Amino acid sequence: MPRTMAHTDPQLAYKDEAFLDSAAARPLRILAEYLQPLHAYEQQRVHDTIVFFGSARLRADGPLGRYYDEARELARLVTEWSLSIPSPACRFLVCSGGGGSIMEAANRGAADAGGRTIGLNIGLPHEQRPNPYVTPGLGFQFHYFFMRKLWFAHLARAIIAFPGGFGTLDELFEILTLCQTRKLDRPIVVLLYGTSYWREIVNFPALMRHGMIAEEDLGLLNFVDTPADALTRLRAALGSESATTAPSFARSRTCESAQ
C-alpha cells in the first residue's frame, strides 16, 4: 500500500511571514510603507505638515540643551496657531522622526497645545525608539529610509531643521534638492534653526562661490534663532495656504511640466 502524505493546506501568500521577509518580497514591503501612512492620513484627514528635523543625540542638559526647550516651545506655538485656523482643512500638523531628543521635543510641544502630532520612526539598532508624545494612530515604523523621507517631503508645507548630524543633514539636503530642482509642484519653506550652528556646519556661500549652486538657491534658506521668529516666518509664508480636502500629496514635476 502506498504511504499517504499528510495533507497541509497551502498558506495564503500575504500571511507567509517567511516570504514577506524575503528578498523576493522587498517590493511588497516598500509598497506597504507607502500605503499604510497614506491610508492612515486619509482616515484621519491629515492634509499638511510642518516637519521638525534634528538630532537624536542632543541632551536637554548638554551644551546644546536649549534647543530641546525651544523646539518644544516652537511646536506648541505652531500647533496653537494651527488650531486657531477656522477651517480644519487649512491646519498643519507637527511631524517629526518620532524618536527622542529634538524629535521628542517637537511631538511633546504639539501635545502640550492639545494638537495631533505625527511620528515617522525608523528601525535602527540603536538610538531610535518611539517617543510617547506621538498621537495614537499617527505613529509609523519604517524600515526603508527613502520611504520615510518620502513621507517627510510630500505633505510638508515647511521644514524646521534644528542642529543635528548625518541624519538631519541627509533629511535637510533631500528637501533642498527637491526645492532646487522643482521636483515638487509647490514650495516648501525651509527654516534653519540656530544660525551660528548652521553657518559653522555648512558653508552655503562657498557652494555658490565655487559655482556648485546658484545665488538664487541661497534664497531657499531662512535662518532663525527664536521660536517667535520662526513662527512669524511660518505665518507669513503659510498664512494664505488654500484649503485641501485630501492628503495633499505633492505631484512630482515631469520634465515636460517643469518647462
Description of each model-found segment:
Residues 96-162, 166-169, 173, 198:
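Phosphate/pyrophosphate-binding betaalpha-module
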Residues 46-48, 89-91, 113-116, 135-136, ...:
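Short coil/turn connectors at secondary-structure junctions
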Residues 192-259:
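C-terminal functional extensions of proteins
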Residues 179-187, 212-216:
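Arginine/glycine-rich "motif VI" loop of SF2 helicases in the C-terminal RecA-like domain
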Residues 6-8, 17-120:
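Glycine-rich beta-alpha loop segments
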Residues 111-112, 174-179, 206-209, 238-239:
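Short, solvent-exposed amphipathic alpha-helical segments in soluble enzyme
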Residues 35-54, 143-161, 176-180:
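Glycine/serine-rich loop-strand microenvironments at binding/catalytic pocket rims
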Residues 30, 73, 77, 105, ...:
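Alpha-helical scaffold segments in soluble metabolic enzymes
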